[in-house]
């Protein structure tokens, strides 16, 4: 049994001859250069075929790889619909820059492109569109005379055929070798885009990695709607230039898509896999000549003749109840395909103001809403329903956009008031509210505002200069909060209940003074008991009223709105 333990082991003798020589049988197998790709963000090695199947998105860290213009065509454009324009337009050497012609030829051979942008007409899920796609492989997507000319011709094509325009940006900025000819393309394209806007046509930009320099400072940031792929580098000046100028290290995430969205310059960050669907939906939301489908079948709710027993304080308490439906509850139940857009294009995005486009019975409608939270975390995110200046500026931007595309506007009001804080004052809270008031009175599209909860002071009025102002039965609309009223007049905020009952803040009070146009009665005296029924009441009233308002010509609409506010006030001549 133990003999095997002590059995002598036999070894094979190996010659040391040629051990130091290279054994060709041990060489690594030859792997084609394009078989594997390395993610620059996480360092993972990815099988290229799998990467392409995944829209060139890293499956480990979700990094979006840079892709060619023609790969973009395959991903976005319906098969068989792409018709390229101006393919043979090529660069010359206006400054006789040494070596420029040779570099152009090498770039053309390497990329199979004639220039840094391809342009054409194609369909995105059936929506015919003029499309420009930049390619950073060609001179880093820099903008010279040809890029400027091809994009300008595309804009003119959009105007001529009344088609929307989509531009995918990917650029290092100006083409150094073309000097001032390059710089002037920024003005040339912007001038053409001005004509596109005057024609009332949609322009969407999709910012991809990288979008910098003169492209950022011109057509990239002029879209009616600005989308971006996640993590894209977007900025005007380069990071090194900024660091050298300010002699400081820049923060992590600086000049990314996420950074720009936080600061109010991007409407939406969209994963590449969802880009085609997102673009298609935006294009559908901007179709011309839409009509309400079921207008003739609509019946609005009858007036509830039973007296509501709640006093003003009771209604205020109900309006503030955390179970009361929020603006987003109504948006989800009333509108189809609601798409939210972000940013004021100046400073930031205020999550207290929700804005976007949705479909109301077949008609695209711009929706602006003040949103409260249901718990502490959500209330912190929504700033307890108190908008900052950037919220009002975002609202005005979207309302101006609605005017351009002839869309009616509905505003949901639910705020204790505009945010009172040092930073809000520094950023011009008063100016932001004032600009909304003066602009809303002259918007050439119908506007309906609905107070669904609290309507607090100028913070509510900033979204209420409308053709029709409605209130839910248990909503309130006031000069300021009863607590503030009691503090100012009686220096005792504990008298808020008494203040509420003398301030005339209920829907019945305000309707009796003709300060609002309609009361929407709540199911079972409480909207929170049946959100769907309440939503249906609002929806039917909106369809009916918008249909009436859209029949008015421009002058009649604006005159009626002006006169609505002109006659407000109680006074007499002293005898």
Swiss-Prot record:
Q: Which PROSITE patterns match?
A: COA_CT_CTER, COA_CT_NTER
Q: Which residues form the CoA carboxyltransferase C-terminal domain?
A: 295-548
Q: Which GO terms describe its biological process?
A: fatty acid biosynthetic process; malonyl-CoA biosynthetic process
Q: Identify the InterPro entries for this entry.
A: Acetyl_CoA_COase_a_su, Acetyl_CoA_COase_Trfase_b_su, ClpP/crotonase-like_dom_sf, COA_CT_C, COA_CT_N, Znf-ACC
Zn-finger (C4-type) residues: 39-61
Reactions that this protein is recorded to catalyse: N(6)-carboxybiotinyl-L-lysyl-[protein] + acetyl-CoA = N(6)-biotinyl-L-lysyl-[protein] + malonyl-CoA
Q: State the compartments where it is located.
A: Cytoplasm
Instruction: Provide the cofactor list for this protein.
Output: Zn(2+)
Instruction: Provide the residue positions that the database annotates as binding Zn(2+).
Output: 39, 42, 58, 61
Domain CoA carboxyltransferase N-terminal residues, every copy: 35-301
A Gene Ontology cellular component where this protein is annotated is:
acetyl-CoA carboxylase complex
Name the domain of life.
Bacteria
Function noted in UniProt = Component of the acetyl coenzyme A carboxylase (ACC) complex. Biotin carboxylase (BC) catalyzes the carboxylation of biotin on its carrier protein (BCCP) and then the CO(2) group is transferred by the transcarboxylase to acetyl-CoA to form malonyl-CoA.
> What protein name is recorded for this chain?
Acetyl-coenzyme A carboxylase carboxyl transferase subunits beta/alpha
Classification lineage: Bacteria, Bacillati, Bacillota, Clostridia, Eubacteriales
